Amino acid sequence: MGREINQRKAAIIGCGFVGSATAFTLMQSQLFSELVLVDVDFDKADGEAKDIAHGIPFAGQMKIHAGTYEDLSDAAIIIVTAGAGQKPGETRLDLVHKNVAIYESIIPRIAEQNKDAILLIVSNPVDILTYTALKLSGYPENRVLGSGTVLDTARLKYALGEHLSVDS
């Protein structure tokens, strides 16, 4: 802590499907000059970083690399995608106990390194995990954001459109 925040640096915690897709999207967006990928499996994060880096010549300039929690100290935004995958027949609420346990191990480590970043929570169930991250991090409320329920809204609109035979 005590380092100046780099407003053009982002970090992603969790390099599964969502984390990797988020990293690729951020690389294409050119919003950041540096992106750090952190995962419990460093080699996985390193492989994802290298794969995405190969697309940089077509998108602009960005430094993308695997890192550790220490690399979060100057990140402006930390996106948390880590969590257990949802199994067939399992509801998002079934994920609560698994993902809260995961958050209990990672959120304090994030907060140790950086108290000034914005935390963007993406893992499901996002509302409960956003609250969990808020409590575990000690961050002020305006610095812990959840990705919301846009996907749920899209699914509902689609289902209603199908049921009513109208465009969604």
PLM region spans:
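Conserved N-terminal Rossmann-fold NAD(P) cofactor-binding segment
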Residues: E34, V38-A76, E90
